[in-house]
């Protein structure tokens, strides 16, 4: 049942100004409720806006309705990671050796060790290999060991996403290219290959197989038969092109790319061997990531799921994704006062639930903590749109927020600074989980009706923001 909240601030204003102010308060509530009705969204919509200085709720509609947060939950993951790891935390990737290099040969073991860096890419790996070549390494006669157990191996984030979705990859202590591999093909699928492209390097990936088949649907199939195997419909490859596909077994993929880059530099390696415990060894190369605050800034801007899961797992120290999500859920309840059900750190899982009021109170509480004081600066700045839908770039109202989208789910939460200097915190959610569940998994990349539904949800969000921007 729809509900509207009038705060003590509105009541006191009414008592001080006779009968006019209460009418104004009722008019405001009716206006925002009318915006919800005008959006004609199926499912549930709820919102909440509060004064940051006082914590008073100024306007709300179904603020306690549980809804999937989608990627909006990355704001909570950001607070969690900052609290547990600190803004200056760096993830390191290392190449180590158990013996010195002698006349170009390493008679001992060479170890590629991942420290959980979610931003490692092919060019970074290539620079590490180039440094090995400059150090004189030409051949390894011992073993090539690969350590990725700094984080647990996760095959995929959510199992109700189309198998080919590049935003649903595996998670590992050793990551590369957001844990995706690039499928490239020529016209009609005459040739197709997997690559791990960077700007400076283009290694071909042989360990993940691709086969072009003569069928119309499904476009992709995936199987795991000792190696990752994909098939793709020839009908879908009419024009030359490429697309990213998710990698499920991440560490072997990174190991292969590393070995290929070594070969390109004239360094010969034996086949890789995965290990779960690092032996005593001397670092040859140490590659640090950017500071965590920079990683989180990029994560919030591009809504990178694998980054959210990686930093969440690093923060919790848990050995499975469900356990890690539960740890963040408990922390958010205890520290931020957020009552939620969380199944991951990215919001990709559709069974997570938050409320609009809970989200508002959580981000306000988080920003007041020393560890979360920089949250607003990390959130993406967005612009209000005018009645024609054109962004009002550089306008007097400053908004920093995190958006989130799943099939028939759309959310936005963050902070507004009004021209008067007044700070507001807000959360807006619309969701129709039943409609989402009715869509077959293989159709969930572009389900019928999704685009129009999300467009209406975003019109609602902008309308609410425009309305709240007029508050004194």
Predicted regions and their residues:
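A small/polar active-site loop signature that marks catalytic segments
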Residues: 209-374
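N-terminal secretory signal peptides and thylakoid transit peptides that target proteins
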Residues: 1-19
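Small-residue-rich helix-loop
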Residues: 316-430, 435-472
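Short, well-structured active-site flanking segments
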Residues: 83-98, 270-274, 372-376
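Mid-domain, small-residue-enriched loop/turn segments at the edges of structured enzyme/sensor domains
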Residues: 44-46, 103-175, 179, 315-358
